[in-house]
């Protein structure tokens, strides 16, 4: 079984507020488990969320100019 993190623990690992994590859950941008009234986030799902937002060195967004 994967380690389940509370919203507080997930926020601490992300370095963000609990409110941000709750918004991710509400917007269904991160997978979560509901245990009664409690929300838990699997550590592997949190890691996947972090990896999905990773920007590799040397990748620049394409800028459109003019028009």
Regions picked out by a protein language model, each given a short descriptive name:
Residues 1-23, 52:
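Polyanion-binding surface elements
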Residues 21, 32, 57-61:
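Secondary-structure transition/capping residues
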Residues 22, 40-41:
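Short amphipathic alpha-helical segments
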Residues 28-29, 53:
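The DNA-recognition helices of helix-turn-helix-type DNA-binding domains
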Residues 33-38:
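Short Lys/Arg-enriched helix C-cap and helix-to-coil transition segments
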Residues 44-67:
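A short, Lys/Arg-enriched interface patch at domain edges and termini
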